[in-house]
Amino acid sequence: MLFTALFSLITQLLYNIRFAVSSKDIVRNENLYSKLAYTMQKYALKRYKIKQMFIFTLTKIAICYKILISVIFERIVVTMGLTLTEKILKAHLVDGEFVKGQEIGIRIDQTLTQDATGTMAYLEYEAMGVPRVRTEKSVAYIDHNTLQSGFENADDHRFIGSVCKKHGIYFSRPGNGICHQVHLERFGIPGKTLIGSDSHTPTGGGIGMIAIGAGGLDVAVAMGGGAYYITYPKIVKVNLTGKLSPWVSAKDVILEVLRRMSVKGGVGKVIEYCGEGVKTLTVPERATITNMGAELGATTSIFPSDETTLAFLKAQDRADVWSELKADDDAVYDEQIDIDLSQLVPLAACPHSPDNVKSVNEIGKLKIDQVCIGSCTNSSYVDMMKVAHILKGKTVDPSVSLAIAPGSKQVLNMIAENGALADMIAAGARILESACGPCIGMGQSPNSKGVSLRTFNRNFEGRSGTKDGQIYLVSPEMAAVSALTGYLTDPRTLGDMPEFKLPEHFKINDNMVVPPANEADMDSVEVLRGPNIKPFPQTSPLDDSIDCQVSLKVGDNITTDHIMPAGAKILPLRSNIPAISQHCFTVCDEDFPRRAKNMGKSIIVGGSNYGQGSSREHAALAPLYLGIKAVLVKSFARIHRANLINAGILPLTFVNEADYDKINQGDEIVLADVRADVEADMSKLTVVNKTTGVEIPVLCELTGRTKDIILAGGLLDYTREQLSK
């Protein structure tokens, strides 16, 4: 019995061994060591009987125990490899246990903002009272609101520029390029962590960074030296083999991944690309793939840092920041997808979702009205050179409008010098400035019911600025050849493809990046505030109970473009929450802002994948201003859920999705004693529909930290409390 008892103790020890061993992610071996422990226990019960002297037996058992544990420790520590994602996260871990599914806090090395989300991020940063950023590098980009049809955008840009100068942030001026393209070229470093107030920040994964899109307040906290919190993600291995066929592109790779996984298939996951096929892709091609990983709902996507990465950095005169990074050979992944690059064909994402993917042959003959080439997904030097090659000596079809936006000043300069830009112009292309432009509905809206081929990353309904526009997401190669024919055209009809190589040396000119003032001079810098700059909206601690009406009920896959539209008319209001809130949800219900404001406080009910798309925290701040106290849905998109918590809005999900049908717009909903329940760490709450008398179980899944944020009334108030301690 003694022997059996001791082996039972070993069994328990093995289940808890992860707390004794360094964070080699021992938990992954739980099946291995639990089976081993069970076998030992069973063996002890059946085979051993205590027949020897007590002391002799105890000594023998102790020796066996020591040897056994030593062997098990050595086996687990030696054999368990790490994924690339785990290596970087582990190196940056500052809070929490390195255990899958748990919340962890990581140190952030770099941040980026763009101007549509940046104004609010810097207002939030100022409110924290931290005099100078504490990151290794923070950069503010002006690339969204570049259509200055009124004073608002120009005023906001002056505000951002002055904040940057005062607080230690680099400022990329209008015209220097799209944030993700420029950051990849000039600031990205393998192995570093980056968060940005734009959902396509994972572009940095193409250079081997853990690069994550986040809300502006999360970025502000990181600039102040705070950790960024995520749930330890599942890690999906995408094993690439073979080589892309002529005229098949990196865009087709990510469209294939979207076709397989869907727009919510990546939620809670990091997509890690591995395999021999990786070597055949350049850094800009890899960045195209990681960029659109955002459309999977993934936390981020990442490629290894290898000789190809080194070649790119050398060409940018930044070889000194390179380091080789890859997963261990015996790394264990949660899922695996295998893609033979040689088997891929030209693909297109059809209206109105990036995962509505079909081959060009499946779509068939399709008359088009417009082609737009550019965006942070496909505006690199090689993308532009391919387009110029296809257009050279030809003319755009008379029925098609072709617009091209190079991704950065560097790219624009180089294609201007080598003649590629002249070839585009001669063919009939309209050249736009190096900015986001049409991708965010900032100009170039298609005609009514117009069919537009775009090399962008999103084709949500109405995002183009034309509500009934039919937007197809395609590669630059398909876009260019289709502009010539007037129909959706397979680029493989072009025949042999010439080799397009990255240059050995890019043209380096960082004169449009303004460095901050020296720390000694920062106090003399005046922050410039125009009349469009309004303070962060007031928040309040979580109420004792919530008793209010449902002001809006919406369906599945509601995007942040539905919640807080973009476009040339609305984007200039991003620093003015009272004004921009008047457009909240108007694409779904024009009366919502007035109705919600009149109710004083209310609840929104939605379907699955609520809040997918852009990282814009305005999709939480505008509802906050309109009195929204809670959002009850089937499931949330990651970034939007975090933004709701940061705004102090309670995120709730149905226990049973069928209960969605038991609540209607206008119903009165009660969450009694909700504050006490949250304080008591109760994850299962009860919503009472007073209108119908039905009780509905809901989940309120908060960690210790996010619970405190909700109780405080949002991340800004929570951070102020922490800084005051």
Residue spans of the language-model regions?
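Short, positively charged and aromatic/hydrophobic N-terminal segments
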Residues: 15-17, 22, 33-39, 43-44, ...
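Hydrophobic, low-acid, alpha-helix-prone terminal segments
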Residues: 10-13
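Family-specific functional microsites
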Residues: 28
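Low-acidity, Ser/Thr- and Arg-rich intrinsically disordered low-complexity segments
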Residues: 8, 22-23
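Fe-S-dependent hydro-lyases/dehydratases of central metabolism
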Residues: 77-725
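Flexible, polar/acidic helix-loop-strand segments at domain edges
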Residues: 5
